Amino acid sequence: MELWYTEQHTEDVRFSIKVDNQLYSGQSEFQRIDVFESKEFGKFFTLDGLMMVTEKDEFIYHDMITHIPMATNPKIKNVLVIGAGDGGTVRELTRYETIENIDMVEIDKLVVDICKEYLPQTASKLEDPRVHIYYEDGLKFVRTKENEYDLIIVDSTDPFGPGEGLFTKEFYGNCFKALKEDGILVNQHESPYYASYAKSMKRAHKRIKEFFPICKVYQAHIPTYPSGHWLFGFASKKYDPIEDLNSEAWNALGLQTKYYNTDLHMGCFALPNYVKELLEKEEE
């Protein structure tokens, strides 16, 4: 009998992957966690039936959420990562020797434990001595911080369930306060393609714009995320991700990446017209 993992992207659209084995299924205090194995995408893990990470395409997401801000300001030393229980974002950050401290805040310890066991590809650097993991609510954690971080990466789930508070006006205001005067905020910004995701994207963008003088959106193609067309938000008190891109300094680091490069950095901020229109329209 064939086994298929199926995820509902809209009322009328579903996405399926043929599964060889289910490696883990469990319920934490916050959410259901499943790990599957497939021929096409390798091992992948889901939360409450929604795709988070696959071994085959995780490099795209983690490259784009990490290297865009790092190439804009290669002097970043102190980083806060909210969410990111799979460890992929932290893995990419630890490649920068100039980063001195990475605080990672993940609400669900079981996510981290499961990813360490089944997804060492992404969780391999969580033991780095610069990494400090806090198992608590990111919304509450950031409330207590002021003028502390050079970069905050919000690597959250979608805006419901445990990740809901990470899309609120209060949260973005606290992120602004927690950043230094030249700080950068990067977040996963949902997809513009299906209406329900586009609504969340517009709301997040509007709220971030209320606090940050520089507020841009960039894109990547992530095959296993709804529609494949995924957005990220870049907000800063000082740096423009295009004008301040330091290609020479970043390329001199000699980092080998599978998706990101500094040409792509320039291009990913060039958005299709329908996305521009969505961002320009005020959220109803």
From Swiss-Prot:
The PABS domain, residue ranges: 2-237
Protein's pathway: Amine and polyamine biosynthesis; spermidine biosynthesis; spermidine from putrescine: step 1/1
GO molecular function, one term: spermidine synthase activity
Chief site of localization: cytoplasm
Keyword Transferase: yes
Active site: 155
Cytoplasm listed as a keyword: yes
EC number: 2.5.1.16
Binding residues annotated for S-methyl-5'-thioadenosine, in chain numbering: 31, 106, 137-138, 162
Classification via Pfam families: Spermine_synt_N (PF17284), Spermine_synth (PF01564)
GO annotation terms (biological process): spermidine biosynthetic process
InterPro entries: PABS (IPR030374), SAM-dependent_MTases_sf (IPR029063), Spermi_synthase (IPR001045), Spermidine_synt_N (IPR035246), Spermidine_synt_N_sf (IPR037163)
UniProt: spermidine binding residues: 62, 86, 155-158
Reactions catalysed: S-adenosyl 3-(methylsulfanyl)propylamine + putrescine = S-methyl-5'-thioadenosine + spermidine + H(+)
EC supergroup of this enzyme: transferase
Compartments (UniProt record): Cytoplasm
Gene3D superfamilies found in the cross-reference section: Spermidine synthase, tetramerisation domain, Vaccinia Virus protein VP39
Cellular component annotations (GO), alphabetically ordered: cytosol
Family: Belongs to the spermidine/spermine synthase family.
Subunit structure: Homodimer or homotetramer.
UniProt function note: Catalyzes the irreversible transfer of a propylamine group from the amino donor S-adenosylmethioninamine (decarboxy-AdoMet) to putrescine (1,4-diaminobutane) to yield spermidine.
Name under which the protein is recorded: Polyamine aminopropyltransferase
Organism: Alkaliphilus oremlandii (strain OhILAs)
Gene name linked to the record: speE
